[in-house]
Design a protein with these regions (language model features):
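Conserved donor nucleotide-binding strand/loop of the catalytic core
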Residues: 34-36, 49-84
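Donor nucleotide-sugar binding loop of glycosyltransferases
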Residues: 14-17, 44, 100
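N-proximal low-complexity "stem/linker" segments adjacent to membrane-targeting elements
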Residues: 1-27
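Acceptor/aglycone-binding surface of glycosyltransferases and processive sugar-polymer synthases
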Residues: 68-70, 74-84, 89, 98-173, ...
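Hydrophobic helical membrane-anchoring modules
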Residues: 174-259
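Short loop->beta transition adjacent to catalytic acidic/histidine clusters or analogous donor-positioning motifs
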Residues: 3-6, 26-38, 47, 61-64
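A conserved acidic beta->alpha catalytic loop
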Residues: 41-50, 97-98
Length: 259
């Protein structure tokens, strides 16, 4: 029986790239491994959900599509997708094709003795100001959380590492910071970023500052947590809130979450 890899992708207004992304992931993962593709539509305002349904209908692979009842942000959507994953390994990448699916194989090959391998960002496909602020943010993240300074959300993780991350007692999620806070054995592998497949980045300057603030809150919240803090409550609430469909025909709609 082949090993299963779960590929988790947060989706926000990515209808133009989803079909190509799904094809490239399948060609990269199969047939060496069994693919579980998990797409999390984080309240897109375009037709991303419709495209996801079409991919699910046409795909021979196991595909799980989750639609959040409210916008969780990229990191919240990633953690929700990971909470549904069943693979021995999990890969996380963006839906805009800047994270090249073909790099997953190299990250897995470099994972011996590690819990997580980041795709160390290489290549400049953004303005100078955004490039410099991004470097500053990742340097701060590395100093506070202990992850590689070139780490981004594109990474592969062992099943046990995912469980450690989801068990962290934080209510302000910052996915990359949580990998560091869980004290996982992590490293980075240089990976060239591609040009954006379509559209433009949803990260305005204000939103990038908000992400940095959430990262700082996540780290401080964990460092100064009470000894009896609840484990995994936030992720459990998000998981219960979602609508999930897979290509077995199952539809689960638990309704709105308690807020």
């Amino acid at each position: 029986m082949t090993e299963t890899i779960s590929v988790v992708i947060p989706v926000f207004n990515n209808r133009a790239t989803l079909a190509e992304l799904g094809d490239r992931i399948r060609h990269t993962v199969e047939p060496q491994r069994t693919l579980e593709l998990i797409l999390v539509d984080d309240c897109s305002t375009d037709d991303s959900w419709t495209v996801m349904a079409e991919i699910m209908r046409d795909s021979p692979s196991r595909l799980v599509a989750i639609r959040t009842p409210r916008n969780l942000g990229q990191h919240g959507a990633i953690l929700l997708g990971l909470s549904r994953a069943r693979g021995a390994w999990c890969a996380v990448l963006d839906a805009d094709l800047q994270d090249r699916p073909e790099a997953i194989a190299g990250l897995l090959a470099a994972a011996a003795g590690c819990d997580a391998v980041f795709a160390g960002r290489r290549g400049r496909h953004q303005g100078l100001v955004r490039l410099l602020t991004g470097k500053l943010y990742r340097a701060l993240l590395g100093a506070l959380a202990g992850v590689p300074s070139d780490a981004g959300t594109f990474c592969v993780l062992r099943r046990e590492a995912v469980e450690c991350i989801l068990a962290l007692p934080v209510t302000t999620p910052s996915f990359i910071a949580m990998i560091g806070l869980a004290r996982l054995r992590a490293k980075s592998l240089p990976v060239e970023r591609a040009q954006r497949g379509a559209g433009h980045s949803a990260y305005s300057t204000g939103l990038r500052l908000a992400v940095a603030w959430r990262m700082l809150r996540c780290v401080l919240e964990y460092r100064f947590r009470p000894a009896d803090s609840a484990i995994g409550a936030t992720i459990g609430t998000w998981a219960a809130a979602s609508t999930m469909r897979d290509n077995s025909g199952a539809v689960v709609d638990p309704g709105e979450p308690p807020l």
